[in-house]
Amino acid sequence: WMLYEHPNYTGHQYFLRRGEYPDFQQWMGLNDSIRSCRVIPQHRGSFRLRIYEREEFRGQMMEFTEDCPQVHEEFNYHDIHSCNVLEGHWILYEQPNYRGRQYYLRPGEYRRYTEWGAVTPRVGAFRRVQEMF
């Protein structure tokens, strides 16, 4: 599941795997207010994500098919201004090692970071959403 702090899938986002979460702090929530949520569909195929240094798919580009715990070590940039999800579903994290704010990306084009709900272009890590059972 992907939980959202505000209605219409806005505000802080929280990715939850199957399990029990008796307290919002156990899923790294900043508060206990959830106003919208969505199921992340199962994806059994391959994964492909292209990240770009600048908006509108400009600047340096790298393509990934695996999780990346430290974007800066692979991409040499701390900021990602646009991306294209070619296959699979992905979670972007604001800080390295899958920490900080989370952003759910479905297949499609994201021409600027605000389109995935971020307030800054900072991306420290990302991972594939894989089968969770």
From Swiss-Prot:
Annotated protein name in UniProt: Gamma-crystallin 1
An individual GO BP term: visual perception
SMART domains, per database record: XTALbg (SM00247)
Keyword Repeat annotated: yes
Assigned protein family: Belongs to the beta/gamma-crystallin family.
UniProt superkingdom: Eukaryota
GO molecular function per UniProt: structural constituent of eye lens
Domain comment quoted from the record: Has a two-domain beta-structure, folded into four very similar Greek key motifs.
Organism expressing this protein natively: Rana temporaria
Function: Crystallins are the dominant structural components of the vertebrate eye lens.
